[in-house]
C-alpha cells in the first residue's frame, strides 16, 4: 500500500483484494467476473499465477487491463505472447532443485557443508522482449530436446 502512494494516478478499488481458491479455473473466473463488474480496472497484480494456469482463462482483449504475475511457468507464457500479461516475475525453479541436490551430494558424499547460510535465487522479469529466451529454459529443464530426438 505504501508503494501505491507513489503513483497518484493509480487507485486500489475499495474491495481491491480478491481472494479465490487456488484452483486455476476458479481463479480465472473470479478475475473475469471482477473485471466485467469493474471495467475501470486498469491492471492486476497477481501474487499467485493461478488465473494464468488455464488456457484462454482471461476473457478480455489484450491490453485492456495490464497483468503482472508471479511465476513464469509454461502455461503462463502464452499470456505474455498474447499480450494479456505484460510481466511475469520468474523464479529459478530449476536452480532451486539443482542447487539443493548439489548441496546434499556434497554433504553426504564429500562431507562438505554449504559455504553460505542462505542462497538467494535471482528473479527474472519475463516480457515479450525476452519471452523466447526464457521459454528455452523450460525446454532445457524439461529435457524437451532429448524427448524430441
Q: What are the roles of these predicted feature ranges?
A:
Residues 16, 71, 92, 123, ...:
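Residues at the C-termini of beta-strands that transition into short coil/loop
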Residues 95-149:
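Hinge/cleft segment of the Venus flytrap/periplasmic-binding protein
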Residues 1-2, 24-28, 72-76, 91-112:
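Hydrophobic alpha-helical segments within soluble ligand-binding/sensing domains
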Residues 5-9, 32-39, 81, 105-109:
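Sec-exported extracytoplasmic/periplasmic mature domains
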Residues 9-12, 64, 84-85, 122:
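A generic structural signal for alpha->beta connector loops
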Amino acid at each position: 500500500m505504501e508503494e501505491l502512494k507513489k503513483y497518484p494516478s493509480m487507485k486500489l478499488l475499495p474491495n481491491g483484494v480478491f481472494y479465490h481458491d487456488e484452483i486455476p479455473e476458479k481463479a480465472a473466473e473470479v478475475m473475469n467476473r471482477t473485471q466485467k463488474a469493474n471495467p475501470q480496472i486498469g491492471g492486476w497484480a497477481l501474487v499467485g499465477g493461478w488465473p494464468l494456469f488455464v488456457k484462454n482463462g482471461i476473457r478480455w482483449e489484450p491490453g485492456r487491463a495490464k497483468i503482472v504475475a508471479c511465476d513464469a511457468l509454461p502455461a503462463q507464457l502464452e499470456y505474455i505472447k498474447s499480450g494479456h500479461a505484460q510481466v511475469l516475475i520468474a523464479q529459478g525453479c530449476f536452480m532451486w532443485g539443482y542447487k539443493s541436490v548439489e548441496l546434499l551430494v556434497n554433504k553426504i558424499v564429500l562431507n562438505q557443508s554449504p559455504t553460505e547460510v542462505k542462497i538467494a535465487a535471482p528473479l527474472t522479469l519475463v516480457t515479450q522482449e525476452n519471452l523466447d529466451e526464457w521459454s528455452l529454459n523450460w525446454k532445457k529443464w524439461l529435457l524437451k530436446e532429448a524427448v524430441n530426438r
